[in-house]
């Protein structure tokens, strides 16, 4: 199958404070590498990844947004048309966890144009257990209260990074309204068959 042949295109947005590891998560997922030293994202960056789920080949355009305050007005425009939103915090910095509710989820509520968008909370840097300031239970409870999926990851240790995107994709595919959002970025070329066992592969 040609690289650009796919059944669906979905837009996924990574948001969170500067330094929580959004760019590292994205690079780990799309390129399979971890970059120890990365510069802060200026404005927005994006990468493309193809996954096959439930027999459907999906193109994910994953947008990595700047976490700095001075880029907030620029970042806001990128919420539009996103079928998936990943809120990332650093488990070793409680302020980044608290910022999800105080800042990022508020922005999502204001700027998102896809009512059924799937939300996920990702707790990153869990390999730094000795420095942890936010417990797993606290992260789970927060995600549940806000109607989000929840995954703990480590881009450095390559822990559950792929799992996070795979779970998000399966949930998107399981939401019929998101398969019909052609006007806001989702391209529907076929219906997802029912009754198939869930499964995801990278290709």
From Swiss-Prot:
A molecular-function term among this protein's GO annotations: GTPase activity
CDD domains (alphabetical): Rab18
InterPro entries: P-loop_NTPase, Rab, Small_GTP-bd, Small_GTPase
Lineage of producing organism: Eukaryota, Viridiplantae, Chlorophyta, core chlorophytes, Chlorophyceae
The name this protein goes by in its record: GTP-binding protein yptV3
SUPFAM superfamilies found in the cross-reference section: P-loop containing nucleoside triphosphate hydrolases
Annotated S-S bridges: none
Compartment annotation: Cell membrane
Residues annotated with Cysteine methyl ester modification: 203
Recorded superkingdom: Eukaryota
